Regions:
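Terminal hydrophobic membrane-targeting helix
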Residues: 35-36, 48
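Terminal amphipathic alpha-helical/low-complexity segments used for targeting or macromolecular assembly
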Residues: 1-33, 39, 102, 135, ...
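Short-chain dehydrogenase/reductase
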Residues: 41, 137, 155, 161, ...
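N-terminal start-of-domain structural block
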Residues: 39-41, 45-46
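Flexible, glycine/small-residue-enriched loop-and-beta-strand segment within the central core
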Residues: 25, 46-56, 61-149, 175, ...
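Beta-rich strand-turn-strand
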Residues: 141-155, 160-164
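Glycine-centered loop/turn positions within well-structured domains
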Residues: 168-170, 178
């Protein structure tokens, strides 16, 4: 089973090297089952872990060499922690990574739904869903950790590490990401950036 998952991730990575944007989108939607909204764009070299666990809204841009983690998250019977790839877990969350409409995700962003528990003697995988709401802007080389919700209209400055929720219409930055200022709530733009090659 693990070999099949690894091969599937490899195929999704190879797809990111296809030059034609339209061909990549077709494969992401129909072969890898990523839910991708109308007029959204996934740039060259984007990579996915468990792509079927990812939902992307309309008019959203995913930048070059972004990494999106859609690993399925399963809730433990004790309702205390979350992990994957084990029969002792149940209740899958179907789309653990949800990205809204008109979201701009710059290049080299890393979004994770899973990590390892460093205090576990077995180094167990734990995680939680990540939600990125509408009109969010994420700068280059940002890292978003499991369980984070980034509120509508928020901006995450380049290089930030997001370890906790970001309030709507705020700008955050730093390691770990902290509040910088508020953003205008009057957002009506639509991101339409699809090109044949990108």
């Amino acid at each position: 089973m693990r070999c099949l998952i690894d091969f599937w991730v490899y195929l999704a990575t190879v797809t990111g090297h296809i030059l034609s944007h339209r061909i990549r989108l077709f494969l992401y939607r129909h072969l890898f089952r990523i839910k991708i909204g109308k007029d959204s764009s996934i740039h060259w070299l984007a990579r996915f872990n468990q792509p079927a666990g990812i939902a992307i809204g309309h008019n959203t841009i995913i930048g070059n060499d972004a990494f999106l983690d859609g690993r399925f998250v399963w809730e433990r019977k004790e309702h205390k922690s979350i992990a994957a790839y084990s029969r002792e877990f149940f209740n899958p969350i179907v789309r653990p990574l949800q990205i809204g409409n008109n979201v701009s995700i710059a290049g080299e962003v890393r979004i994770y739904t899973m990590e390892h528990d460093i205090d576990s003697p077995d180094f167990k995988e734990i995680g939680a869903p990540v939600v990125i709401e509408d009109y969010v802007v994420i700068g280059s080389r940002v890292t978003i950790l499991p369980g984070v919700t980034i509120g509508k209209g928020a901006v995450v400055a380049s290089g930030a590490v997001v370890t906790h929720d970001v309030a709507p219409y705020t700008v955050v930055g730093g390691v770990p990401a902290e509040f910088i200022k508020n953003r205008s709530k009057d957002l009506r733009y639509q991101l339409k950036f699809a090109r044949l090659f990108q």
